[in-house]
Amino acid sequence: MVKLRIRSSQWYDGVDNAPHRPYLRAVGLTEADFAKPLVGVLVSWSELGPCNFHNLELVRYVKEGVKEAGGVGLAAPTIVVNDGINMGTPGMRYSLISRDLIADTIEAQFNSHGVDAWVGIGGCDKTQPGIMMAMVRLDLPAVYLYGGSAEAGWLGERELTIEDAFESVGAYLAGKITLDELKRVEELSFPTYGTCQGMFTANTMATLGEALGLSLLGSASPPATSARRRKYAVESGRAVLKAAELGVTPRKVVTYDALYNAAVTLFATAGSTNAILHLLAIAHEANVKFTLDDFDEISRRVPVIAALRPAGPYAMQDLDRIGGVPRVLKKLYKAGLLRPEALTVEGEPIGKLLERWEPPAVPEAGILYDVEKPYKPYSGIRILRGNLAPSGAVMKIGAADKLRFEGRAKVYDSEAEAFKAVAAGEIKPGDVVIIRYEGPKGAPGMPEMLKVTAAIVGAGLGDAVALVTDGRFSGATRGIMVGHVAPEAAVGGPIALVQNGDRVIIDGEAGLIKLEVSEEELEKRRKAWAPPPPKYKGGLLAKYAALVQQADKGAVTSPSAWGT
């Protein structure tokens, strides 16, 4: 296996490198180990939340698979930011930032220790795209392994996810439930370790890991508590050295066709709008031209076929019971919606893998539908453009009952202001809530608005009120919500010019978001507008605000598509 040690041999072979070897002898390597490929096992782990709590256990099984394949595995950590805990707090500014930090820390760790290949174990919303970005950036043989989602909770016969906890706050504030009922949902909605249970951002990105070909087929859906997690950990350890032998690296996998397949899968599952940002960032790292125009074109041909929360009533564990993500992919493949020649880390095109895969003899039970008779006839997400978002915006329509909305603007310059208004009952049917200065540069960090959106839905206003923001949404968001408005307010985008009472038109079917104000009036407002002073003058947030690009570019911070 000397041919697989192209990198580690430069660090650890020969007389010149004799002083390097004692460092690895001290952590358990033997003389024989120095002749084996060195495989990094990147793990996101933290006790500050359940999403990555169990991932350390998976390291042992990945290393077991690496050993079986003739390599030696050594683990290294990366950071974790728990989105759910930070929702509606100043900490949410660090969420999207952590994605790029994770990619950067992986680059620094593995490029400075000479690993020949690696397996990345991730769990929550930003660890996954951060790991995938690093896979493409480093372009070493690599496999992504998901830690798995938490089991759903139960309140009587009602299946609960964390979405219920957020929406129950709005229901309580609106007087629809008691404090005791809210407390009961809080206690029962997240019963095990693992990630949030619906097709929210974490499960969306795990699903897209399979669609992109960066993960082993079938590895996304088993719950974190399942013994199959350990099985896939061992198999991922074996697979990464097989990929190395075959010369399969992430840049050969993440092609236009792979991104196309990921977009199709995203729309068919009504996944998180955050995935648009993350796929744009992964494409950026791969130096593949894949833009909002591509998402727009694909979205118009793909219906929703999965009844997963928040678009439907089911959790990821329910999809797992009927075959998981491969069952989704096979339906899309048989309908001619996937590009079957896209290569995977398993060394074969995704079409070949799906041809061999057979679903379990379990009825789909309303969890999954055929493309010809879909759950919803339109895609889960639609790209909008218009004078309010010249560079684009993203609307999640799979979890909304209305595709078109017209109303009067109520403008708030922060999420906190908007939440206070919702809690005080100031938001009325027909309002278009505008939350601005929450974009990549303005917040900075483009925080998610789940606290506000869940409060709106919980108050019973989900179909009667729309929300438009230059910030982001949680994957658990539902209702009439438009985010990622670009350009953002902080750089003078038209959203900065909206005033209370302005009429706003949102049309998901036409892909339109329009501010019904004359160009002459907008120009007058533009001349009167001045950029706000930076919220931070030092530290990480200031650095991020200086580097980050707009949402339509994936909110990336890397100045180059090729970071090696």
UniProtKB/Swiss-Prot annotation:
Q: Which family does it belong to?
A: Belongs to the IlvD/Edd family.
Q: What PROSITE patterns has UniProt attached to this entry? A: ILVD_EDD_1, ILVD_EDD_2
Which GO MF terms does the UniProt record name?
A: 2 iron, 2 sulfur cluster binding; dihydroxy-acid dehydratase activity; magnesium ion binding
Cofactor(s) recorded for this entry are: [2Fe-2S] cluster; Mg(2+)
Q: In which pathway does it act?
A: Amino-acid biosynthesis; L-isoleucine biosynthesis; L-isoleucine from 2-oxobutanoate: step 3/4; Amino-acid biosynthesis; L-valine biosynthesis; L-valine from pyruvate: step 3/4
Iron-sulfur is among the record's keywords: yes
The record describes its quaternary structure and partners as: Homodimer.
| KW Chaperone (keyword) present | no
Task: Give the EC class as a word.
Answer: lyase
Q: Where does [2Fe-2S] cluster bind?
A: C51, C124, C196
Q: PANTHER family, alphabetically? A: DIHYDROXY-ACID DEHYDRATASE DAD (PTHR21000), DIHYDROXY-ACID DEHYDRATASE, MITOCHONDRIAL (PTHR21000:SF5)
- Where are the N6-carboxylysine residues found in this chain? K126
**Bound cofactor: record note:** Binds 1 [2Fe-2S] cluster per subunit. This cluster acts as a Lewis acid cofactor.
Task: Report the EC number(s), separated by commas if there are several.
Answer: 4.2.1.9
Q: Where does Mg(2+) bind?
A: D83, D125, K126, E448
Q: Name one GO biological process term.
A: L-valine biosynthetic process
Keyword annotations:
2Fe-2S, Amino-acid biosynthesis, Branched-chain amino acid biosynthesis, Iron, Iron-sulfur, Lyase, Magnesium, Metal-binding
What the entry lists under SUPFAM superfamilies is as follows: IlvD/EDD N-terminal domain-like, LeuD/IlvD-like
Q: What is this protein called?
A: Dihydroxy-acid dehydratase
Q: Where is the active site?
A: S474
**Matches recorded under Pfam families:** ILV_EDD_C, ILVD_EDD_N
InterPro entries xrefs = DHAD_IlvD/Edd, Dihydro-acid_dehy_C, DihydroxyA_deHydtase, DiOHA_6PGluconate_deHydtase_CS, ILV_EDD_C, ILV_EDD_N, IlvD/EDD_N
Q: Which reaction does it catalyse?
A: (2R)-2,3-dihydroxy-3-methylbutanoate = 3-methyl-2-oxobutanoate + H2O; (2R,3R)-2,3-dihydroxy-3-methylpentanoate = (S)-3-methyl-2-oxopentanoate + H2O
Q: What does this protein do?
A: Functions in the biosynthesis of branched-chain amino acids. Catalyzes the dehydration of (2R,3R)-2,3-dihydroxy-3-methylpentanoate (2,3-dihydroxy-3-methylvalerate) into 2-oxo-3-methylpentanoate (2-oxo-3-methylvalerate) and of (2R)-2,3-dihydroxy-3-methylbutanoate (2,3-dihydroxyisovalerate) into 2-oxo-3-methylbutanoate (2-oxoisovalerate), the penultimate precursor to L-isoleucine and L-valine, respectively.
